[in-house]
Amino acid sequence: MSEQQTVSQKEQYNLNKLQKRLRRNVGQAIADFNMIEEGDRIMVCLSGGKDSYTMLEILRNLQQSAPVNFSLVAVNLDQKQPGFPEHILPAYLESLGVEYQIVEENTYSIVKDKIPEGKTTCSLCSRLRRGILYRTATELGATKIALGHHRDDILQTLFLNMFYGGKLKGMPPKLMSDDGKHVVIRPLAYCREKDIERFSVAKGFPIIPCNLCGSQPNLQRQVIGDMLRDWDKRYPGRLETMFSAMQNVVPSHLSDYNLFDFKGIHHGSEVVDGGDLAFDREDIPMQPIGWQPEDADDAAPVRLDVLEIK
């Protein structure tokens, strides 16, 4: 066997292992939050980025073995940004045989008219996009809207709200849309961004850049993202533990009196959630909860090749 064949087999082995992990993560999230039910028609929001490509690929894969029957329709919103490569997504989706719809709405002009030059346009753009996607879901008869946010996005949102909004509020894996008509799901909620990056590189997805509009990045989100990546590098397992904490909330040991009846505590009341542990030395596990050591091959650096738009 040649060296090239050996490398190819090794790469395929690592890809298969990575895909199994992503499948397991997505399948677990779907089960935990009852994201997909019998007969669902899932509208998969496809932006052309690594996350939405991965979401579509894993959902297509799960379709073949899921205990329930569901259908997929991929939807991309062409917002008429200058230089947007209109041919990329149709060609890719047709090659897969996936049902799809390209929705053309010139929100770019609206945003440029309303937002001063050099300011972040993402907030207004996302509101406009959300309304169009809700309308499209109704037109397509979709029962669920699938978005490509992953675990790291959820943690970023938690810290953004803590640091800048004064709230313990993250990004739910499943919710009712703000128009009260659609169920929104995030199948990648348990998936790590670095796994998605590796998978995207290995699969060779035709990535479309997200900054065609020329908008400046959200500085706060960028700072939080850099902080989390630094923690993940310096303290392996920290992100896993923080995400586990989001699923293990103890309201009686926080300070929100709307979530727990502190006023109702009197002499003779029952001990709740272990009472006061402030004076005890807590048993802290040697390894962070949820952490698993990575294989050397899994930890290889990656670089996403983005299509050059001319």
From Swiss-Prot:
Its EC number is 2.8.1.-. A motif (PP-loop motif) lies at residues 47-52. One of its GO terms (biological process) is tRNA thio-modification. Its main location: cytoplasm. The keyword Ribonucleoprotein does not apply. [4Fe-4S] cluster binds at residues 122, 125, 213. It holds the Pfam family ATP_bind_3. One of its GO terms (cellular component) is cytoplasm. It catalyses: cytidine(32) in tRNA + S-sulfanyl-L-cysteinyl-[cysteine desulfurase] + AH2 + ATP = 2-thiocytidine(32) in tRNA + L-cysteinyl-[cysteine desulfurase] + A + AMP + diphosphate + H(+). It is found in: Cytoplasm. CDD domains: TtcA-like (cd24138). Pathway: tRNA modification. Its cofactor is Mg(2+); [4Fe-4S] cluster. It is an enzyme of class 2 (transferase). GO terms for molecular function: 4 iron, 4 sulfur cluster binding; ATP binding; magnesium ion binding; sulfurtransferase activity; tRNA binding. Keywords: 4Fe-4S, ATP-binding, Cytoplasm, Iron, Iron-sulfur, Magnesium, Metal-binding, Nucleotide-binding, RNA-binding, Transferase, tRNA processing, tRNA-binding. Binds 1 [4Fe-4S] cluster per subunit. The cluster is chelated by three Cys residues, the fourth Fe has a free coordination site that may bind a sulfur atom transferred from the persulfide of IscS. InterPro entries: Rossmann-like_a/b/a_fold, TilS/TtcA_N, tRNA_Cyd_32_2_STrfase, tRNA_thiolation_TtcA_Ctu1. Homodimer. Belongs to the TtcA family. Catalyzes the ATP-dependent 2-thiolation of cytidine in position 32 of tRNA, to form 2-thiocytidine (s(2)C32). The sulfur atoms are provided by the cysteine/cysteine desulfurase (IscS) system. The thiolation reaction likely consists of two steps: a first activation step by ATP to form an adenylated intermediate of the target base of tRNA, and a second nucleophilic substitution step of the sulfur (S) atom supplied by the hydrosulfide attached to the Fe-S cluster. This is tRNA-cytidine(32) 2-sulfurtransferase. The gene is ttcA.
